[in-house]
Amino acid sequence: MSKQDLIEMEGTVMESLPNAMFRVDLDNGFNVLAHISGKIRRNYIKILPGDRVKVELTPYDLTKGRITYRLKNKK
């Protein structure tokens, strides 16, 4: 599977789960279970409930994803 096959969507983190897993509510109304990518883990970027994030999904399983970016909060 190549990077072109990935589906990238935005959503809001609803819940923090054990083992760096998060429940994310996507903008289209679906809920996914997402883990954080290696770059976010390596750079110690904190993800908290309420944060806006970008999530990559595979076309094979649309219920699981990877958080690739934490969006800036609009104030």
Curated annotation (Swiss-Prot):
One cellular component (GO) term of this entry: cytosol
One of the Pfam families matching this protein, by short name: eIF-1a
Metal-binding is among the record's keywords: no
PROSITE patterns registered for this protein in UniProt: S1_IF1_TYPE
Record localization: Cytoplasm
Keywords in alphabetical order: Cytoplasm, Initiation factor, Protein biosynthesis, RNA-binding, rRNA-binding
Gene3D superfamilies listed in its UniProt record: Nucleic acid-binding proteins (2.40.50.140)
GO molecular function annotation: ribosome binding; rRNA binding; translation initiation factor activity
Presence of keyword Ion transport: no
Domain S1-like: 1-72
Protein family according to the UniProt entry: Belongs to the IF-1 family.
Annotated PANTHER family: TRANSLATION INITIATION FACTOR IF-1, CHLOROPLASTIC (PTHR33370:SF1)
Function: One of the essential components for the initiation of protein synthesis. Stabilizes the binding of IF-2 and IF-3 on the 30S subunit to which N-formylmethionyl-tRNA(fMet) subsequently binds. Helps modulate mRNA selection, yielding the 30S pre-initiation complex (PIC). Upon addition of the 50S ribosomal subunit IF-1, IF-2 and IF-3 are released leaving the mature 70S translation initiation complex.
Quaternary structure (record): Component of the 30S ribosomal translation pre-initiation complex which assembles on the 30S ribosome in the order IF-2 and IF-3, IF-1 and N-formylmethionyl-tRNA(fMet); mRNA recruitment can occur at any time during PIC assembly.
Protein name listed in UniProt: Translation initiation factor IF-1
Lineage: Bacteria, Bacillati, Cyanobacteriota, Cyanophyceae, Synechococcales
